[in-house]
């Protein structure tokens, strides 16, 4: 579960390394974001000559969480860390052209099919 002030790793090649959640989108007093939810983030750590710079405010979709995701068959998929993929603020398409690490099947809707197709592994 991701909330305000949570630090996340970035799972794409946009140039950011670490981001911090500053708002969970989708409701006036929404507290937690799970896998597949869109959040507002600020870049805390970035590599030189990347597509994004430190201090930029962007949207991101959560792709991995330590708390995991519960499936309807009762199974629970957990990850070692929290990770997100950065999105353009206007059209919510990914900034990076590559995705690192596995992503879950919960992202499989019309909005995030691009992330599913770029990911090396879908759990």
Swiss-Prot record:
One of its GO terms (cellular component) is cytosolic large ribosomal subunit. PROSITE patterns: RIBOSOMAL_L14. The keyword Kinase does not apply. Pfam families: Ribosomal_L14 (PF00238). It comes from the Bacteria. Keywords: Ribonucleoprotein, Ribosomal protein, RNA-binding, rRNA-binding. Part of the 50S ribosomal subunit. Forms a cluster with proteins L3 and L19. In the 70S ribosome, L14 and L19 interact and together make contacts with the 16S rRNA in bridges B5 and B8. PANTHER family: 50S/60S RIBOSOMAL PROTEIN L14/L23 (PTHR11761), LARGE RIBOSOMAL SUBUNIT PROTEIN UL14M (PTHR11761:SF3). Binds to 23S rRNA. Forms part of two intersubunit bridges in the 70S ribosome. This is Large ribosomal subunit protein uL14.
